[in-house]
Amino acid sequence: MKCPFCNFEESKVVDSRATDDNTTIRRRRECLNCNKRYTTYEKIEDFPVLVVKKDLTRENFNKEKIINGLIIACQKRPVSRKQIEDIAYEIEKSISNRMVTEIASKDIGEMIMDKLKQVDEISYVRFASVYRQFKDINTFLEEIKNLVVN
């Protein structure tokens, strides 16, 4: 690694530690030529996951979209911001663990509903009504019936 002060290419690592979120390693280095210290960060290279939408267009996965959808579904319900962020984080990790470059928006929606059902059933029905595009009250009743049976 080149020293930012003198461009010498050799250095030694003086200190190394993980950042708070454990996704990056912070290293303090000392140049073997000028003896000045500098900080570098080492991180695993992320490959963006593309979401394939119903109309077959693709866009980058965005955890914030999940959070925003959950905030709307959970409005005036006993669901904390932390619970919402935890759901979004778990879904993001699940997608990342699949090691895929593309995922269908349908799959993400199902993952959200599975998690939301465990947290708050009313929020689940709200989310499902928009996600599954309920057309009438009978569709609502059918979903609630399935929720009660399971």
From Swiss-Prot:
Cofactor note: Binds 1 zinc ion.
Alphabetical list of InterPro entries matching this protein: ATP-cone_dom, NrdR-like_N, RNR_NrdR-like
Ranges where the ATP-cone domain occurs: 49-139
Keyword Nucleotide-binding among record annotations: yes
Entry annotated with the keyword ATP-binding: yes
First and last residues of each zinc finger (unnamed): 3-34
Membership in a protein family: Belongs to the NrdR family.
Designated name of the protein: Transcriptional repressor NrdR
Organism expressing this protein natively: Clostridium botulinum (strain Alaska E43 / Type E3)
Gene name tied to this protein: nrdR
